[in-house]
């Protein structure tokens, strides 16, 4: 079996995690504000796309909020890309049973999730506007299968914790279908997942359910796997060109339904290119942030619940700054 070396250093991977977690954390705060342009994450709403274009072309004091609200969730595809990248480098040479692999990664996700979930349940009851849980909602979160339950928009709480169920599904798909398999299997699964989505109603429940589960995350995950196997490296000017082109594609593809499915691919290309060309001083900061990304992800729904009321009462950037500091 080939030992893949990959094209990203540990520091570059950590810097990408830093960028991704900042996007996710700031998005999850910003999109709770009524004035913010809402994202197209699980479904595609044309008015949201039109709204961000209007915000970009008519710059206001709140443009950063609009950009974070609309684009920040694309930190998730970067994490999926890096997860597959790391799995390929770490596990494709050693032999390990499918059951042992799945058991170990379930335990890893559960231990990362449970402390934040337990604390959030307490904070949620204390702070105004507590969520009404049903028993199956909690069981689904503890079992990391709540993405599969009906109406995931209202079942999964805190909302960002849908990522744990998504990652568990992708771990299973990787080990059972993609582990040490021909690249054609990976590309074929990407194509199947795309076709399952592209014929759906842009605002329909079917698309919403698919994108809460591994079907919606397959593109960046598969890209990470293939990149780990076949990346050969580029020159600095080529990475710079890729960064510019991919950034333009992120914005352009976000405006049209069928093109929107490919935005995560452009986001992953942009993230890789940026860490390759970003000055070391900035990358060092991102590496540090990436090192605490797991803690930030687990804790940020709790701090959001506490500080969001400040921004909702008019002090938008004051609340956001307190949220960042906390």
Residue spans of the language-model regions?
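Membrane-cytosol interface segments of multi-pass membrane proteins
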Residues: 1-193, 313-326
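Interfacial loop-to-helix transition and helix-capping segments at the boundaries
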Residues: 11, 63-76, 152-166, 200-223, ...
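Aromatic-anchored segments of alpha-helical transmembrane domains
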Residues: 22-29, 142-148, 190-203, 242-256, ...
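Hydrophobic transmembrane alpha-helices
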Residues: 81, 85-92, 170-178, 220-232, ...
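Short, aromatic-rich membrane-interface segments at the entry and exit
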Residues: 133, 182-188, 209-215, 235-241, ...
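Hydrophobic alpha-helical segments of polytopic membrane proteins
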Residues: 179-192, 226-249
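Alpha-helical transmembrane segments of multi-pass integral membrane proteins
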Residues: 246-326
């Amino acid at each position: 079996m080939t030992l893949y070396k990959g094209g990203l250093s540990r520091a570059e991977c950590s810097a990408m995690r830093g960028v991704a977690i900042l996007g996710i954390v700031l998005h999850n705060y910003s999109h709770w504000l009524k004035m913010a342009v809402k994202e197209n994450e699980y479904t595609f709403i044309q008015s949201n796309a039109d709204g961000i274009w209007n915000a970009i072309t008519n710059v206001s004091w709140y443009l950063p909020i609009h950009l974070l609200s609309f684009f920040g969730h694309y930190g998730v595809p970067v994490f999926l890309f890096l997860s597959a990248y790391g799995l390929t480098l770490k596990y494709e040479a050693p032999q390990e049973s499918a059951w042992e692999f799945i058991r170990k990664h379930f335990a890893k996700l559960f231990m990362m999730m449970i402390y934040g979930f337990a604390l959030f349940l307490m904070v949620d009851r204390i702070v105004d506007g507590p969520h009404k849980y049903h028993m199956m909602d909690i069981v689904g979160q503890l079992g990391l299968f709540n993405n599969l339950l009906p109406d995931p928009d209202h079942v999964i709480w805190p909302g960002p914790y849908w990522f744990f169920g998504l990652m568990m599904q992708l771990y299973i798909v990787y080990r059972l279908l993609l582990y040490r398999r021909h690249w054609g299997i990976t590309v074929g699964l990407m194509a199947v997942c795309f076709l399952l989505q592209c014929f759906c109603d842009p605002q329909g429940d079917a698309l919403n359910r698919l994108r809460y589960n591994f079907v919606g995350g397959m593109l960046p995950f598969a890209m990470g796997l293939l990149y780990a196997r076949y990346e050969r490296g580029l020159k600095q000017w080529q990475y710079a060109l890729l960064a510019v082109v991919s950034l333009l594609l992120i914005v352009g593809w976000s405006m049209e339904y069928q093109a929107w499915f490919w935005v995560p691919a452009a986001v992953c290309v942009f993230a890789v290119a940026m860490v390759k060309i970003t000055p070391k001083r900035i990358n060092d900061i991102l590496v540090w942030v990436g090192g605490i990304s797991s803690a930030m992800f687990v804790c940020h729904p709790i701090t959001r619940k506490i500080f969001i009321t400040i921004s909702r009462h008019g002090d938008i950037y004051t609340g956001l700054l307190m949220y960042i500091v906390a």
